[in-house]
Amino acid sequence: MAALYPALTPEQKKELAEIAQRIVSNGKGILAADESTGTMGKRLSAIKVENVDENRRVYRQLLFSSDPSVTKAIGGVIFYEETLYQKTDDGTPFVKLIKDRGIVVGIKVDKGTVPLAGTDGESTTQGLDGLAERCARYKKDGADFAKWRCVLKISKNTPSALAIAENANVLARYASICQQNGLVPIVEPEILPDGDHDLKTCQYVTEKVLAATYKALSDHHVYLEGSLLKPNMVTAGQASKIRCSPQEVAMATVTALRRTVPSAVPGITFLSGGQSEEDASLNLNAINQLPLERPWALSFSYGRALQASVLKAWAGAPANIPAAKKEFEKRAAINGLAAQGKYVPAGSSGSAASESLFIANHNY
């Protein structure tokens, strides 16, 4: 066996561990506001708003300038590169606005998925070229964590062993590069909800993917205490005729995590995966009420499940901004409670919160 060459200094490890803990402490989670320009275009066109720089800036300003009470539930915000350099109406950089509230700034660093040759329509994620230089710049410009998404799907022939191994290795390379540059890596091996598979199949595949991911992270000497995991919840496929209860989703999800994720990882921040806002909150709540030992913080890193109602309330009108902020504050508070297993639904959650947010072969 090769000699052990320490990759990170004790000071680097301490900083990374402290950042990771801050993001997920006391029921806090992450607002994923890292939609690419193309994805924001789809979101804005749904409310008949033009996809231009200023409209994207105004919308993100709406989210970032909500009532300070959201800091009880939001520990981190993931930016898209464009957002990292945008400012509020009065000239305050978004990065300063967020950091002044005690929220950690993150940045999406991958360059999207590309086809993986020799597979049945599977993909890998690009963006490793120049990543070290970009991470160093983002750290200097105020970011303290990063996100990289890999995508796998369940079908008769997928995920293949090749796709699992390739994506695990890419995630590990990314995580190692981030840590060398002072950024906490969020590792996101998303298994898409597309398909008619049952809960048991999703659990099996999730376990295989996470086991491969953590083997790769070990091979690449990634410091787990200074990292976070962003997995899918274990659910039946979107086209499955069987609808699972939050308790069934919780048991399958936590069982898969207990079998594969080392307890050194400080936090697991679930993606919403096209669930409705309310389903994402109910499932997270059930996960945190499960009578099984859970050595990690189990929280959220939601994009659509924190923003769908906000977008509808805003609809691009300046007069609607206060109402839209209220919607965001409400969803943030609900998920902050769910991350502690303390969410008690109060009857009807409103039509927008109950709408499925599923998008086939979702890409952003």
Swiss-Prot record:
Tissue specificity is: Expressed mainly in the liver and also in brain and other tissues, except for the heart muscle.
Q: What is this protein called?
A: Fructose-bisphosphate aldolase, non-muscle type
- Catalytic residue positions: 230
User: What pathway does the annotation place this protein in?
Assistant: Carbohydrate degradation; glycolysis; D-glyceraldehyde 3-phosphate and glycerone phosphate from D-glucose: step 4/4
Q: What is the lineage of its organism?
A: Eukaryota, Metazoa, Chordata, Craniata, Vertebrata
Oligomer status and interactors: Homotetramer.
Which one Pfam family would you cite for this protein? Answer: Glycolytic
Which InterPro entries does the record match to this protein? Aldolase_I_AS (IPR029768), Aldolase_TIM (IPR013785), FBA_I (IPR000741)
PROSITE patterns per UniProt: ALDOLASE_CLASS_I
Write down the EC number: 4.1.2.13
Q: Provide the GO MF annotations for this entry.
A: fructose-bisphosphate aldolase activity
UniProt: substrate binding residues: 56, 147
Alphabetized, the UniProt keywords read: Glycolysis, Lyase, Schiff base
Q: What class of enzyme is it?
A: lyase
Q: Where is this site: Necessary for preference for fructose 1,6-bisphosphate over fructose 1-phosphate?
A: 364
Catalysed reactions, as listed in the record: beta-D-fructose 1,6-bisphosphate = D-glyceraldehyde 3-phosphate + dihydroxyacetone phosphate
Origin species, per record, is: Lethenteron camtschaticum
GO BP annotations of the record are:
glycolytic process
Q: Which family does it belong to?
A: Belongs to the class I fructose-bisphosphate aldolase family.
Question: Signal peptide position in this chain?
Answer: none
